[in-house]
Amino acid sequence: MAFLNLFFCLVFISPLMAMPPVLQGRKSISPDSILKDTSTDIGAREFQGRKFPNFMMQLYQNIIRGRDNDLSNLEHPTLQESDTVQSFIAKSYTTVGNRWTLFFDMSSISRSNELKLAELRICLPSFRKSHSVTVDIYHTNDGKEKLFMGSFKTKLSSALDSDCKVFNLTILLQNFLTRGKRLIKDEYIQAKGLHLKDLEKSATEKDTENVDTMKQHQYHVSDFAAERIMLVVFAKEQSHAKPDPPSLGQKLFPSKYGIDDNANKVNGFRRLRRNKKEKTQIHVSTVPPKPIEEIKPECKKVDMFVDFQKIGWGSWIIYPKAYNAYRCESTCAVPQNETENATNHSYIKSLLPLSDMERKECPSCVPMKMMSMSMLYYENEDFILRHHEEMIVEECGFKDM
């Protein structure tokens, strides 16, 4: 399992199955009640000196604010099956007449994830002026190796008056990732227009329709706005038979959450043998116990604010900057061992500077219902929107021991 593995990347079984994973729990998660940085300009486009795609920011806003209608007809049903949205900004592109060649670094795509949708988004005026275009897709890692992934032809209708053209590359990417096959096909991809507000139009591109100048030009990311050419991948992490460690903890410290089956068996054997010895030392008393008035402690939900900047995660988490994760509190003699039932919430809690009394939890006073949370962050030069399970305590209660 990756962090946010987003990132979101944006999976849980609950009565809200009909709702997209990235939208589940939104009834209780609101910018006012959960997100602590409500004063932050959520429309900011700068992060660590880099501009992040306007599309990713809009998608994040739509998710946390429940704007289903703002999603396209293709993206809305896809989000119901996805928990991660990953964006890849083009490293460079070349044009020769009406032939466009795009280069992306897709090294961070996990083959263990199930690809749901791949969209190529091109927001260049020169591309809109072309009528018949051939597009070649390449994977490149640090510009050293260029691997051809597939190609397609499309006719752009002049009636499609929009800022961006969006192409469905799901089949192309699935064929390459699962079978290693290159896909070359004519007209299998339909162009559709998608209007993006606040699209930067500062960059100027030469008209590639001037065939007389067949000289090849190469443009790099620095020459145009970040979202001008971008590949957006919607995916879902594959389910496993064994329960996975917290996605946040596994992302940062994978070795810490490694599981040694042999060690578990040995520890289990020692624990069983110790319990047997303890049982043999128990003596039955003939004196009846005195009646004790039973006082049930209160198990309640209290605030637990998480500031990602303070725990050292501010350099890669874009939104939210902070949030209220809550925790369960009750008087208890025996604290809970948080390693027994590790969750994203317990991992976050272990990083906070809580007092000993705040850190202790009763084994019987535990979260009864937890919510997931979508996060937008920067990883491996890619911007990722990922949905993480068990991030916020919604209800506390006593469990049977």
UniProtKB/Swiss-Prot annotation:
Q: Which gene encodes it?
A: nodal3-a
InterPro entries annotated for this entry? Cystine-knot_cytokine, TGF-b_C, TGF-b_propeptide, TGF-beta-rel
Quaternary structure (record): Monomer. The propeptide region interacts with bmp4 in a non-covalent manner.
**Gene Ontology CC:** extracellular space
**What induces or represses expression of this protein, per its UniProt record?**
By Li(+), siamois and wnt signaling, including wnt8 and lef1. Induction by wnt8 is inhibited by vegt. Not induced by vegt or activin.
Disulfide connectivity for this sequence is 299-365, 328-396
GO MF, any single term? growth factor activity
A single Gene Ontology biological process assigned to it is: gastrulation
Its protein name is Nodal homolog 3-A
